Amino acid sequence: MRHSLAILFCLGTVLVLGGCASAGQQRGLYNNAYVSTSNPAVSISVNGIPWKTGGRSHGYLRNASMVGAPSPDVYTQVFGTDARSPMATITHAVVNDRWYWNDVTPRVGAIDEENVVIGGAGFRAFTYLVPRNNDPFGGVVGDPTDNGPAYWIARYFARVVDFRLGKIILEYREPAPQGMVSLSGNPVGQSGFVSQFEKRAEKAFSLGTPGSVGQITNSRPADIRWAFMRDEFLGDCTENQPDFNDD
């Protein structure tokens, strides 16, 4: 009985989220927005920053709870022009039903963790300095390295979707002010910069529902460092355990 009720609950939730996956499901760039036609049905666009590159490949999770860590399907789009200007990314990572995404947790050194709402959807957000050595988007629009070591400052927004099989990550970046090497001890006067940066980040993305979508083609863009599309950026997963008490 409990198993039957669980099935009915899942079916009802899927209908609310936009219907079951089918052969017609598409995910990728359409009209300069990332579109997923189901699970969930969503359209995400970046405001005021031109599209640079994007496509589909796989992530590499190393810290999953069990042996045989998953290699999620990763759809990602990058928006930006150069390392002196803002940059934004949209990432949708999907695991198979052997796994589920854990709750969103901040990266080491992150600050200002909070819940925010973008386009009516709830996200967990935090701000951090991007380490260039393992940045999956390093070099796509260049790196802010003028006048010595420098970093991107990033505002990271993430939410789990589709019964925790999917995770949507929105990230907005700007070149960090020169001399900013840590967010826990900002030089005097830079706390105001961080606050204003976070406000700009929240306005960078628009969410909606996809309308009629034409054919989407996904390639594997070579300029994204897929080997670093790992736990540090994507987050971690846990393996589903069988319920031996289920009737």
Language-model regions, residue ranges each:
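Bacterial N-terminal signal peptides that target proteins for export
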Residues: 1-9
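Intrinsically disordered, low-complexity segments enriched in polar/charged residues with Gly/Pro
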Residues: 2, 29-31, 146
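Bacterial N-terminal signal peptides
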Residues: 8-18
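Generic marker of residues within folded, mature protein domains
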Residues: 10, 40, 160-162
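Polar low-complexity intrinsically disordered regions enriched in Ser/Thr and small residues
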Residues: 15, 22, 83, 112, ...
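N-terminal targeting sequences that direct proteins away from the cytosol to non-cytosolic compartments
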Residues: 20-75, 181-247
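Conserved polar/disulfide-associated segments of primarily extracytoplasmic proteins
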Residues: 58-169, 175-186
